[in-house]
Curated annotation (Swiss-Prot):
Protein name: Glycerol-3-phosphate dehydrogenase [NAD(P)+]
Native source species: Malacoplasma penetrans (strain HF-2) (Mycoplasma penetrans)
Sites where the protein binds sn-glycerol 3-phosphate: K110, G141, S143, K196, D249, S259, R260, N261
Main subcellular location: cytoplasm
Role description: Catalyzes the reduction of the glycolytic intermediate dihydroxyacetone phosphate (DHAP) to sn-glycerol 3-phosphate (G3P), the key precursor for phospholipid synthesis.
Length: 338
């Protein structure tokens, strides 16, 4: 097993879980963050904010100094909130000029760029150039950070322009409990990974109202159809929906209280929009992406009533208590599929 030096940008749950997995695979892992408490915690063998008093089963190092974190790393992983990607790319760019022949970039950030409505790999390309885009791999799939950290069996997908590099990254992560499977759809993987979070808010809200698997299944069915419409308009491949990054990730995010987006949706009914947003302390990707989703739906003139309705809730235009009633009307108006 080769010992690679790996830099992970981020000290959150996902960054720490992936760092732990890579360290267990025999690599040297450095995490970079801006929170001194989290950095110190990681250096003492814990990340109590996300994993309580569970000690790491392998060694991780963390620092607030970006130059130290990157060092001579062979791999740089972006594991930060999507809202921070712009500024972090600008900082990282300074340290990449002499690494053109070797460094491989890995993106696990979820979202669609708010300004351009483009997938995040295109943002990375615009910031860092075509050379690094050709050495970029994006990972996504059904994977709660806590379960990856606890070494529960997990399967996700990886995609990128260079299939050889994609396979190399897959092997970097693969173990007897964690598997990354290559997929040839850069657009689809990222669109599904982003929009499923908004659907999870919708499902969580409806579940808070009805506590019904029947209702959840109906909203999921219609929501998945809408995601597929949007993805195809953005040039995703039709079959990607059946992959781990498609239906697998959608099911995970839309069916469990472990999902921040699902829980956020439940809180909308209990507390209302304003209070839920004010009290929320975690990254809720579905909330971050709803304006972008609205722009895409408008741009391509897509009929997406479930998405349009949950967007109205988040905009404060539709009472959360009216959302489920609106969904019921949509169910009753469904036409026979031909």
């Amino acid at each position: 097993m080769i010992n690679n030096r790996i830099c992970i940008l981020g000290t959150g749950a996902w960054a720490t879980a992936l760092g732990s997995r890579l360290s267990l695979n025999g690599n040297t892992v450095f995490l970079w963050g801006i929170d001194n408490n989290e950095v110190n915690d990681i250096n003492s063998g814990y990340n109590k904010k996300y994993f309580g008093n569970t000690k790491f089963s392998s060694s991780l190092s963390a620092t607030t100094d970006l130059k130290t974190a990157i060092g001579d790393s062979k791999y740089i992983i972006f594991a930060i909130p999507s809202t921070a990607l712009d500024s972090v790319l600008d900082k990282v760019k300074e340290f990449l000029s002499d690494k053109k022949s070797q460094v491989i970039l890995i993106n696990v950030v979820k979202g669609i760029d708010a300004e351009t409505s483009q997938i995040l790999s295109n943002k990375i390309k615009s910031k860092l150039g075509s050379h690094y885009y050709s050495r970029l791999v994006t990972l996504c799939g059904p994977s709660f950070a806590t379960e990856v950290f606890e070494e529960k069996p997990t399967v996700i997908n990886g995609t990128g322009k260079n299939l050889k590099i994609v396979k190399q990254v897959c092997e970097l992560f693969n173990s007897d409990v964690f598997k990354v499977i290559p997929i040839n759809d850069i657009v689809g993987l990222q669109v599904f990974s982003s929009l499923k979070n908004l659907l999870a808010i919708a499902v969580g809200l409806s579940q808070a109202e009805y506590t019904s698997v029947n209702t959840m299944s109906a909203i999921l069915t219609m929501g998945i159809e809408e995601i597929q419409k949007i993805a195809c308009k953005m040039k995703a491949k039709k079959w990607t929906i059946m992959s781990f990054c498609g239906i697998g990730d959608i099911f995970l995010t839309c069916s469990s209280t472990q999902s921040r987006n699902y829980s956020f949706g439940q809180d909308l009914l209990k507390k209302g929009v304003e209070k839920t947003i004010k009290e929320n302390k975690k990254t809720v990707e579905g909330f971050e992406v709803y304006k972008t989703a609205k722009n895409i739906i408008t741009k391509y003139n897509i009929n997406a009533p479930i998405f349009s309705s949950i967007i109205e809730v988040l905009e404060g235009k539709l009472d959360p208590k009216e959302f489920s009633k609106k969904c019921l009307e949509l169910f009753w108006n469904q036409k026979i599929n031909k």
